[in-house]
Structure formats: structure tokens, C-alpha cells
Design a protein with these regions (language model features):
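P-loop NTP-binding core
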Residues: 1-197
Length: 197
């Protein structure tokens, strides 16, 4: 993919009403190199999303765990930042870097807000998980979503079987947790971005 003016693959209708997916592919790796020499490179995704902005209530952009040009494009195009946090101590250091990056990107996108943090791979039986969750609650307060995505083998098995967790095993903890999180997320963001309902 040499630019974002034309998406790398067609949007696919998901099994849910009003949900489309534009999956990444191997060509996305070329994008970072292609962006490097472009004038206005940090605005490419923002411009591409403008062409479909009236079609969606939400656009979720999954970023790589790096702070390169793809992530800067995503943060510049976004209204809000949702941060999934694996409940381990190294994640605390990573959060400081994410917060710093969000502050830097606000020079390009002053509307970028941290919508919240959601804890993932949570196991209430592990003291470390409880300690990290408590430290995050102390530091981030209400920014931390109350729903926790519990560690669940079905979350790992579903994609390896080519399915989302709801199709794979709707009754598992992972599916229930993500459904609860989606409801909490929608409640928190309702009316914030001019959604069509």
C-alpha cells in the first residue's frame, strides 16, 4: 500500500448489522516506508477517513504496539484513545509512553482525548494482576473502565479458528466480558461524537 487514498482491500460486511471491517494485510508494512517521504504524511489516514465519515458512528483503529508513523496517523485521525492494558507491571511503563505520545500528537490533533483504559488478560486469582489493577485505578481514576477482560483461552482459540469470540464460543467469559465492555464504552461515549443512533 503506497497511500491511504485507496484502501488496501474492500470493506467487508461483518456478521453484525452496521459493522464493516477493513482488515490489515501484509501490504500495510509497506505503508510506513511509503509515508516517510510524503508531505503531510501524518494526515493521510485522517483524509482517507473523511470520505466515509458520514457512514459510521464509530471507527475503531487498532494500532501496532509501536509509536511509528502508522500510529501517529491513527492518533491524528482519532477523536479518542482507548487503551487496552495487559495487567502486568511492564504495561505501567508503556502507559507513560502512550500518555506522552498522546500529548505530542495533540499538537496535530487538539481534540484527541483519552477515553479510557480497559484491563485485559485479567485473572483475579493473581496477586500481581490485582496489584497492577489497583495501581492503575489510583493513577487513572474514572478513566479506567470498570469492566475487566478476563484471561480466557477462548479468546486465543477463536482467531486461530478464523472466528470472532462470539461466533466461536458465545458463552465464554471472554465473550461476556467484551459484550459488557462494549456496553460500558457505548454508555460512556454516547452523544460525544454525534452518533446517528
Amino acid at each position: 500500500m503506497s497511500s491511504l487514498e485507496t484502501p488496501p482491500s474492500p470493506r467487508r460486511r461483518a456478521r453484525w448489522k452496521r459493522v464493516d471491517i477493513l482488515p490489515a494485510n501484509i501490504r500495510l508494512a509497506e505503508a510506513e516506508l511509503a509515508f516517510a517521504g510524503r508531505i503531510g504524511r501524518e494526515n493521510l489516514l485522517k483524509k482517507a477517513l473523511l470520505s466515509v465519515s458520514g457512514e459510521y458512528d464509530y471507527v475503531l483503529i487498532d494500532c501496532p504496539p509501536s509509536l511509528g508513523l502508522l500510529t501517529v496517523n491513527a492518533l491524528n485521525a482519532a477523536n479518542g484513545l482507548l487503551i487496552p492494558v495487559q495487567v502486568e507491571y511492564y504495561a505501567l511503563a508503556g502507559l507513560a509512553l502512550i500518555r506522552q505520545t498522546a500529548e505530542l500528537v495533540r499538537d496535530l490533533n487538539p481534540d484527541l482525548a483519552i477515553l479510557g483504559l480497559v484491563l485485559t488478560f485479567f485473572d483475579a486469582r493473581k496477586t500481581l494482576n490485582k496489584d497492577v489493577a489497583a495501581a492503575l485505578a489510583d493513577e487513572w481514576g474514572d478513566t479506567l473502565f470498570s469492566t475487566r477482560i478476563r484471561d480466557n483461552v477462548s479468546l486465543a482459540e477463536a482467531p486461530s479458528n478464523g472466528q470472532d469470540v462470539f461466533s466461536y464460543k458465545r458463552s465464554c467469559y471472554g465473550a461476556k466480558d467484551y459484550a459488557a465492555f462494549a456496553a460500558e464504552f457505548l454508555e460512556r461515549t454516547e452523544g460525544c461524537y454525534g452518533t446517528r443512533g
